[in-house]
Swiss-Prot record:
Renumbered ranges of motif Cx2C motif 2: 216-219
Region (N-terminal SAM-like domain): 1-140
Species this protein is from: Plasmodium knowlesi (strain H)
Alphabetically ordered keywords of this record: 4Fe-4S, Cytoplasm, Iron, Iron-sulfur, Metal-binding, Mitochondrion
The protein's name: Anamorsin homolog
Length: 242
C-alpha cells in the first residue's frame, strides 16, 4: 500500500488525467499540471512524486525546460519518482518502439540525477503502460539541500498540503504495525464468489485503483470502476459474468 503522505502528483492536461486529479483530490493529495509545475521557480520538497501522462510524452525530452531535473530537485534525499505513461494502440508503434521509449525514459532519468532506475512495460486495454521508478540520491551537497528547501516565498505550496493524511497498514507490512493489533476485515460475498480476507484493495503494480486505462491485461480488477486506495473491493473470482 502506497503511503500518500508528503506526496505530489503531477498530471498531464488530458481527460484521463483530469479524472485522476479529482481522485487524488478526494484523498487530499496535492496535484499540479505539468505546465504549472514547469512554471514555478522553487518547489517544496516531497518524499514521493508521481508523474502521469496519457499519450503525450514529448515534453519529457525537452532539454531547455527539463521537467525530470525539476522533479529531482523537489524530491527529498532518497525520495522516489514514479512515472506512468500510457500509450494508445492508435498512436502507432510496436514492441520495439515501446522498448525504445522505456529505455530512453530510463536514460533521461539517469541524466537528470536519479539512481536505482527501473522500468516495466505492461499491456493495458487498447494500449500499453510504461512504469518507470527512480530514486533521488541521498548524497546531495548541503548547497543543493539548502536550495531545495528555500523559504523565500517562491516555493510551490498547496492548501491541501497541511491536511492530515490517514496512515494505513501495508499488505506486506514489515514494520510490525499489522502484527500489533490491526485486524483484517472478513468479507462475505455471493455464491458466485468466495470468502476472502482483505484489509485494503492492493495491487502489485500500484495502478489498479486508477481504472482500466492504467490496468495491465491480467489485472483482477479489470472492468471495475476506479476506487480509492484503502477501499474494500469485491472481486468476482469465477469465469461467469455477473
Amino acid at each position: 500500500m502506497m503511503n500518500f503522505a508528503d506526496t505530489l502528483v503531477i498530471l498531464n492536461e488530458d481527460a484521463p488525467c483530469e479524472l485522476l486529479r479529482k481522485k487524488y483530490a478526494q484523498m487530499l493529495v496535492p496535484t499540479v499540471s505539468v505546465s504549472n509545475f514547469k512554471k514555478n521557480k522553487q518547489y517544496k520538497t516531497y518524499n514521493n512524486v508521481f508523474l502521469y501522462t496519457y499519450r503525450e510524452y514529448d515534453f519529457l525530452w525537452d532539454l531547455d525546460d527539463n521537467v525530470l531535473h525539476k522533479i529531482q530537485r523537489c524530491l527529498n534525499k532518497s525520495g522516489v519518482l514514479k512515472l506512468v505513461l500510457y500509450i494508445s494502440n492508435t498512436d502507432g508503434g510496436d514492441n520495439k518502439t515501446h522498448d525504445e521509449i522505456a529505455k530512453r525514459l530510463k536514460r533521461e532519468c539517469l541524466y537528470s540525477g536519479f539512481i536505482n532506475i527501473s522500468n516495466e512495460i505492461s499491456m493495458a486495454e487498447n494500449g500499453i503502460i510504461i512504469n518507470v521508478t527512480a530514486e533521488n540520491p541521498d548524497f546531495l551537497s548541503n548547497e543543493d539541500d539548502d536550495e531545495g528547501n528555500s523559504s523565500d516565498g517562491e516555493a510551490y505550496q498547496n492548501a491541501e498540503d497541511n491536511k492530515k493524511v490517514v496512515n494505513r497498514v501495508c499488505a506486506n507490512c514489515t514494520c510490525g504495525k499489522k502484527t500489533n493489533g490491526v485486524k483484517l476485515d472478513k468479507v462475505t460475498i455471493n455464491e458466485k464468489e468466495v470468502q476472502y480476507l482483505t484489509e485494503n484493495a492492493v495491487s502489485s503494480c500500484g495502478n489498479c485503483y486508477l481504472g482500466d486505462a492504467f490496468r495491465c491485461a491480467s489485472c483482477p480488477y479489470k472492468g471495475l470502476p476506479a476506487f480509492q486506495p484503502g477501499e474494500n473491493v469485491k472481486l468476482n473470482l469465477d469465469n461467469e459474468p455477473n
